[in-house]
Regions:
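Helix-turn-helix
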Residues: 1-33
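DNA major-groove recognition helix of helix-turn-helix
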Residues: 28, 38-39, 114
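Short, solvent-exposed positions on alpha-helices
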Residues: 37, 57, 78, 107-112
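Amphipathic alpha-helical segments used for helix-helix packing
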Residues: 39, 67-97, 126-130
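Hydrophobic alpha-helical connector segments
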Residues: 47-81, 88, 117
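Amphipathic alpha-helical packing segments from all-alpha helical-bundle domains
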Residues: 62, 81-116, 122, 136-144
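C-terminal peripheral helix-coil segments that are non-catalytic and often amphipathic
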Residues: 130-159
Length: 159
């Protein structure tokens, strides 16, 4: 996935692992089950907020690590958006809630904040993946928009 930017076939995966394709089906009922397991495993690599930093910094680290993951695995975003399961999204959502716990925001505020942020990050990741050689579009370019988002979130949560 990292080198080709697309989801490989079960046969290609088996060949890379030097195993029979049927061995993969022994552990995964179908390609979608394998994709979900791989995708969740990859998403679990993103920053895990532990509450050691201010919530603003925890959120920034989470977002930038997520974008880096999506940049490093060009086909991952498309795979995740096509999935019917919530596995990968649940990982990000849980970490988002941990990062924002000190904010004491209302549940509706957190849901709206998460929905908005996810859409923004996915749009930014898509732009990076469509222009991989564009040096003017890198993960650090989210600093300004994230700072604005964080200030707005702080104001909204204090209402």
């Amino acid at each position: 996935m990292r080198t080709e930017g697309k989801v490989p076939s079960i046969r290609k995966i088996a060949g890379t692992l030097n195993v029979d394709a049927m061995a993969i089906y022994h552990y995964f009922s179908n390609k979608n089950a394998l994709l979900e397991a791989v995708t969740v495993s990859l998403v679990e690599e993103i920053y895990k907020p532990l509450g050691e930093n201010p919530w603003q910094e925890e959120l920034k680290l989470l977002c930038k690590s997520y974008l880096k993951l999506l940049k490093d695995h060009a086909g991952l975003l498309k795979t995740m958006l096509a999935m019917t399961s919530e596995g990968p999204a649940a990982v990000f959502t849980q970490r988002f809630h941990v990062a924002l716990a000190p904010l004491n925001a209302k549940e509706t505020q957190l849901k709206n904040a998460l929905d908005f942020l996810a859409d923004y990050l996915h749009g930014f990741a898509l732009a990076m993946n469509c222009n991989p050689k564009d040096e003017h579009l890198c993960v650090d370019f989210v600093d300004g928009p994230l700072a604005f988002y964080i200030r707005t979130l702080s104001l909204e949560a204090s209402r």
